[in-house]
A protein has these predicted regions:
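Sec-dependent N-terminal signal peptides
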Residues: 3-13
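Lipid interaction determinants
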Residues: 17-85, 96-157
């Protein structure tokens, strides 16, 4: 009988301890606010200020810098300004978002728009999923299902 009570106590303590280690995340609340994000690739940089709001919408503005190769080892650095709005939600530790409006403006080589329109690179009304790799009070690391991850830092305005 003594052994049974020891085993039952061990099982009880084991389940209590494992329950205490389980962290319940409220991503919907933690993600609210203003974030500065950066996404860097060779020949591509994006910087964005995005605000996630309680009503499930977001708005953002930022800059995209792209190095277009004109000929071998000769690149043209093109700067684009962008503003956008959309909706967001959390599903299974993933940030699901959709762009419903975007405006992209070529800031320094507008003649290039005749050959390449950056605005066409953004899909409207298509949901995208990004895995929330890390989310803390002031930092988030997201990994899109289509590529490498990027990071954002929370800012107070």
């Amino acid at each position: 009988m003594k052994y049974i009570s020891v085993i039952l106590t061990a099982i009880f303590l084991s389940t209590s301890a494992s329950g205490a280690l389980t962290v319940s995340r409220d991503y919907e609340t933690e993600i609210l606010g203003n974030w500065i994000c950066k996404d860097l690739w060779p020949g591509y940089s994006a910087f964005e200020m995005i605000r996630y709001k309680k009503d499930g919408t977001w708005n953002s503005f930022g800059e995209v810098i792209v190095d277009f190769e004109l000929e071998e080892d000769n690149y043209l650095k093109v700067r684009y300004g962008a503003v956008g709005t959309g909706i967001w939600e959390i599903q299974d530790d993933n940030l699901i978002s959709m762009i419903d409006y975007v405006k992209v403006t070529n800031r320094n080589h507008s003649w290039l728009d005749e050959y390449f329109n950056m605005q066409d690179q953004f899909s409207l009304n298509d949901k995208t999923s990004e895995e929330i790799v890390v989310l803390s009070d002031n930092y988030i690391n997201l990994k899109p299902n289509t590529g490498k991850g990027y990071e954002c830092y929370k800012v107070k305005l």
